[in-house]
């Protein structure tokens, strides 16, 4: 089961939590869920170059709080915060609510599964050899503290006539172990021969306490070696 299912979904409520954190009445649920999808699609398209890892949406009473985890926060913030203010106004128009926008810097993009997948997909689009791209990503992740990593690439790799799947793994990736902190990300490479899919699993160690926020806290604070400053920029 652990080999097939999304490892983040399998661990929700154990050491992972949801990216949409709000409650709604039955009549409002569908509308708010559709809003979340539109917000994520808009930000992903608008901030293609910002290396976005994930987008967290929270909805306190009659408000909306959007947190963007990015490896390049400067691109989102812009000169003197001009770009982030434009984004905030657009999001307020989309949600019809008072919207705040927070930026959290991803300190180690080399061990973030989503950013690794995006990087490999971009290299495939630039015609870099898929084995070289995979091996380079694996070496960088292991060098920067990952305990294990697995990468799958599928499609017409290298322009082959028949689509196939190639994978590369180093270290341990225990998908059945629920206490394992496993990050998972996917991306698509639009090549001249068709779409190639990229999947990445990164094992970052084990989380022994039962805490749904443990993995996120480790990602935000762990890179700073215990420092209380996590360079969180907030624009209410």
Curated annotation (Swiss-Prot):
Pfam families: KH_2, Ribosomal_S3_C
Keyword rRNA-binding appears in the UniProt entry: yes
Entry's Gene Ontology BP terms: translation
Top-rank lineage group of the source organism: Bacteria
Alphabetically ordered keywords of this record: Ribonucleoprotein, Ribosomal protein, RNA-binding, rRNA-binding
Cellular component per GO, a single term: cytosolic small ribosomal subunit
GO molecular function: mRNA binding; rRNA binding; structural constituent of ribosome
Start and end residues of each stretch annotated as Disordered: 214-236
Database matches in PROSITE patterns: KH_TYPE_2, RIBOSOMAL_S3
Residues annotated as domain KH type-2: 39-107
InterPro entries the record matches: KH_dom, KH_dom-like_a/b, KH_dom_type_2, KH_sf_prok-type, Ribosomal_S3_C_sf, Ribosomal_uS3_bac-typ, Ribosomal_uS3_C, Ribosomal_uS3_CS
Family indicated by similarity: Belongs to the universal ribosomal protein uS3 family.
Known function: Binds the lower part of the 30S subunit head. Binds mRNA in the 70S ribosome, positioning it for translation.
Quaternary structure and interacting proteins, as annotated: Part of the 30S ribosomal subunit. Forms a tight complex with proteins S10 and S14.
Protein name, entry field: Small ribosomal subunit protein uS3
